[in-house]
C-alpha cells in the first residue's frame, strides 16, 4: 500500500479519506490459489460488519493489490442455488438464486471464502441487500385496461349482471398501483428494476460514512413476501422519502450465504 500511495496521488487521497486503524479478526487468515484473505474489524463502528481485504503479490512484482469491500447488513431469506460465477479479478463473484417464485442474480462479497456454501441445487439462507443505482419517488397512477383477456372477462361479467346494458355502457377496467411491487432484470446480471413501497427509513453509517437504509419488498407473490434493505448515500435517496412512500428505480443486488443451518 505504501508503494502505491507514494506513486499515485489519487490513490493517496482515497486512502487518506478512508484510513482507520483496525485489527485482524482471529482465525480469518486463509490462502486460496495463492491469494491471502484477511478480515479486519471496523474500528469506527464496532457493531457494523467487518471489512474484508484481499492481498495478492503476483510473481516477483514489488506491489500489492488491495481491495476493500464493506459488507451490507441484509435480511435473511431462504433460496436455492442455481449456479455461481467467479469474477476474473478474484475479488467477488455472483450467485443465481431461486427465491420464492422468482429468480435473481446477486453479487457475493468474499466469494472465494464462501463458494463452498453455494453448491448448485442446495438450499440455504442468504442475507439479501441492495444498493441504489438510480432511484425516484413513484406517484401511484392507476393502470387503465380497455382491451385484452382481463377486459373481456370483466365486460362479460358486467353484461351478465346488468341485463339490457351494452358494451358501450361498460367503463374501462382501472387497476390501482398503490403499494405495487415489481422486480425486472436489466442489462447487467445483478442490476434490477424495482418498484416497491417503503416500509421503513433509517439514517445510519457504514465505515464512518452517512448512508440511508430503506426497507423495501424485493418479491411478493400471493401470501409470500421477501424483503430486503436498500442502501444509498443521502444524495442518492430522493428528498422526502419516508415510510409509506413508493419508489421506483435501478438497484444492484447482493447475497451473503449464511453458514448456519436452521430447522
Which residues does each PLM region occupy?
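N-terminal alpha-helical "arm" segments
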Residues: 1-29
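Long, hydrophobic alpha/beta structural blocks
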Residues: 30-187, 191-197, 211-212
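Short nucleic-acid-contacting surface segments enriched for D/E, G, S/T with interspersed K/R
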Residues: 233-249
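Short, charged beta-turn/beta-strand-edge "cap" motif at the junction between a beta-strand
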Residues: 4, 10-11, 245-259
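A structural signal for the main folded, soluble domain(s) of proteins
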Residues: 190-193, 205-207, 235, 243
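C-terminal output/interaction extensions
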Residues: 226-230, 257-263
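OB-fold (S1/OB) nucleic-acid-binding surfaces
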Residues: 95-99, 103-104, 199-228
